[in-house]
Regions:
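N-terminal secretory signal peptides that target proteins for export/translocation
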Residues: 1-11
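Bacterial N-terminal signal peptides
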Residues: 14-25
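N-terminal segment immediately downstream of the Sec signal-peptide cleavage site
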Residues: 31-90, 196-200
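Helix-rich interaction surfaces within compact, conserved domain-sized segments
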Residues: 33, 38, 136-200
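Contiguous beta-strand segments within globular domains
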Residues: 96-105
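Short amphipathic, basic-aromatic surface patches that mediate peripheral association
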Residues: 108-118
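Short coil-to-beta strand junction motifs in C2/discoidin
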Residues: 117-125
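Beta-strand signatures of extracellular beta-sandwich domains
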Residues: 126-130
């Protein structure tokens, strides 16, 4: 059968349209896979103690008598111990994709007390996402080696969470943690992200 120029043109147009539709479908699937599913905007630095009971004693060696807490409640978040000193953070912006990719940008994560207050002191940090509100908790974390905090506390993380978080993260909690392992308290947390349920 002899093919006319018009027939060839029609076949060519159909092929182009079919190819465009296929590419659009692939791009749409990829976009859904890469789409932002969880967003955190803003952060709160750790205060190591969340409650305490004051007794009638005084601080040992203090020049002025001061009450001391004989019983304190550590600020443990979903099984993760707090740092031993106060930390503050100016800003935090984090996005978690459906495929487990996470980007975190933090500003001013520095010590809020002690002899190194007002700066970071050589710590490295990583991010942990926890999706369960009650035990047992599963920690999905970036590389445990972490990224180095400069003196001003600004940092960026661009990594893959391992293990991957569940498809539905019922109660998202993002912790920024110390990469150095304490033999007693493990990888303590320095800051927590503020969850934005509307991805705003």
């Amino acid at each position: 059968m002899k093919m006319t120029h018009r027939g060839c043109a029609r076949i060519g147009v159909r092929a182009v349209v079919a190819g465009a539709l296929l590419m659009s479908a692939v791009a749409s699937a990829a976009a859904q896979n890469e789409g932002t599913t969880i967003r955190f905007k803003g952060g709160i630095g750790v205060i190591p103690v969340s409650a305490g009971v004051v007794d009638n004693g005084t601080a040992t060696g203090a020049t002025t008598a001061a009450p001391v807490a004989s019983d304190v409640t550590r600020n443990i978040v979903r099984g993760v111990q707090p740092a031993g000193q106060i930390w503050v953070i100016d800003d935090l912006d984090a996005k978690v994709r459906a495929n487990g990719r996470i980007t975190v940008e933090g500003k001013g994560l520095i010590l809020g007390g002690g002899n190194n207050a007002g700066r970071a002191a050589g710590q490295s940090v990583f991010a942990t996402l926890i999706c369960q509100a009650t035990p047992p908790f599963t920690e999905s974390s970036t590389n445990l080696a972490g990224v180095l905090l400069p003196t001003n506390g600004d940092f960026k993380i661009d990594d893959q969470l391992q293990p991957p978080p569940p498809a539905i993260c019922a109660s998202p909690m993002l912790l920024i943690r110390n990469a150095a392992v304490n033999p007693v308290t493990g990888n303590v947390w320095f800051a927590v992200g503020i969850f934005r349920p509307d991805n705003d």
